[in-house]
Amino acid sequence: MRAILIDWLVEVHLKFKLVPETLYLTVSLIDRFLEKETIMRERLQLVGVTAMLIASKVEEIYAPEVQDFVYITDRAYQREEILDAERKMLVKLDFQTSHFSSYGFLQRYASLVDSDPFILNMARYLLELSLVEYKMLKHHPSMLASASLYLAQKIVRKPNAWPE
């Protein structure tokens, strides 16, 4: 179910034209919340849009409004439900909304090795694939970022740009 939710949130993220950091923070909020709270399957979409609402407020200059999330869920949830879920999520997470994202690490690593745009875009794609896969949660964000950049370089057969 997590993979289906994340896949749908990627589509929502694209529809709203949000920055990549918002998507990565959204997934982090979902995973940290679900570590602390058991949720029934039919409420998982609510958790997802709530996390994206919070992440948008943190990362975006112009965040989507609550009504946008009501619309995107085809009115499965009302404005008050989303706002109530936002309060509950923030309390459960002790208002800790920031995190070290694999995307942030990737940006830093790519600038260090002076990665060309094609390789960087491929690494971003590989990193986005890791968001959907539950097994990737056990890996540190810096490891996911370096692995995606390394793999992107190998796919295009670029010599190893990593310092020894």
Predicted regions and their residues:
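Structured all-alpha helical bundle cores of eukaryotic regulatory proteins
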Residues: 1-164
